[in-house]
């Protein structure tokens, strides 16, 4: 029987949440520079709210969201940190449409 403290970082649950957040916020949108701050905040807020509803109080979560216009140029992104690989976790989700890219990363650090 696992306790709340023993719960692992479950990538599949987190991915479902961030995919939903992106679809809700960006579905049927066209890139507009002035809207990016609202879109990123909406995605982050929705993700954190749903992640907190998982009731896994043994983690602190960090959510990062990048939205940028498709211009034909390539891009590369990477994240790195020093942590306990046995207990901490992370996942990322990449979404795109005809006018923009969106990359969301979630880090779960066990307390």
Swiss-Prot record:
Keyword hit for Cytoplasm: yes
GO MF terms, alphabetically ordered: dynein intermediate chain binding
Lineage, broadest ranks: Eukaryota, Amoebozoa, Evosea, Eumycetozoa, Dictyostelia
Superkingdom of this protein's organism: Eukaryota
Name the UniProt record assigns to this protein: Dynein light chain Tctex-type
Pfam families found in the cross-reference section: Tctex-1
Database matches in CDD domains: DLC-like_DYNLT1_DYNLT3
Subcellular location: Cytoplasm, Cytoskeleton
TM spans (from-to): none
Keywords assigned: Cytoplasm, Cytoskeleton, Dynein, Microtubule, Motor protein
Family that this chain belongs to: Belongs to the dynein light chain Tctex-type family.
One cellular component (GO) term of this entry: cytoplasmic dynein complex
Function comment: Acts as a non-catalytic accessory component of a dynein complex.
Gene Ontology BP term (one): microtubule-based movement
Protein's organism: Dictyostelium discoideum
